[in-house]
Amino acid sequence: FREVMAKIGIHIKREDILEPMATGSLIWDRVIPASIADRDEKIRQCMELIPQIYKEVFKSVRPFPGLEPVLMRLEEKGVCLGVLTASRTIAVQPLHHHSLIRYFRVIMTREEGFPNKPAPDGVLECLKRMEILPNQAITIGDTPLDIRAGKAAGTLTVGVLSGIGSSAQLQAEEPTAIIERVSDLLSLFDLE
């Protein structure tokens, strides 16, 4: 996103986009001030650039260290996995590129048209497609929105600190558990 903004002449810090991404507030309000005369045009330019730049950015995305062994172990134990993201379909490209897509039974992106998190609709549809009841599921995420959506859907929730949300933001949502990194899932559920 910072690269997109730079292309239209606006330079922002990483922190400027983390809070809106974590909380669901409008990112445009944070990064393109209302005082800019051609604000609507700048937003339009960004919307055109995002798919082009993201396509290149996602080519360089690498999985978190230790992710594949975790996915392998979960698969061995019969755990059904799904992905629900507010991002575009291109955001799951790294799962294909690194041959991790095979571990996920369901992949849902914003193009499916469900209300954004914290609404539970996407979580519930993901569970429906996997034929899992909410009380048998765990929503794992790195933002307060993920935790709220999981709770609203009736699942247990796990906050992961290796992503966007801060420890304070995740703790404020009172998830079932908080872990430092995805690889901690195995010890959390005694699957080591």
Task: Report the location of each language-model feature.
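Glycine- and other small-residue-rich loops at beta-strand/loop junctions that grip anionic moieties
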Residues: K59, L84, G159
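Asp-based, Mg2+/Mn2+-dependent phosphohydrolase catalytic module
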Residues: A6, M72-E75, V79, R88-T89, ...
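N-terminal helical cap/lid subdomain that shapes the substrate entry/recognition surface
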Residues: F1-E68, M72-R73, K77, Q93
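Residue-level marker of regulatory loop/turn positions in helix-turn-helix DNA-binding domains and
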Residues: P63, L84, P115
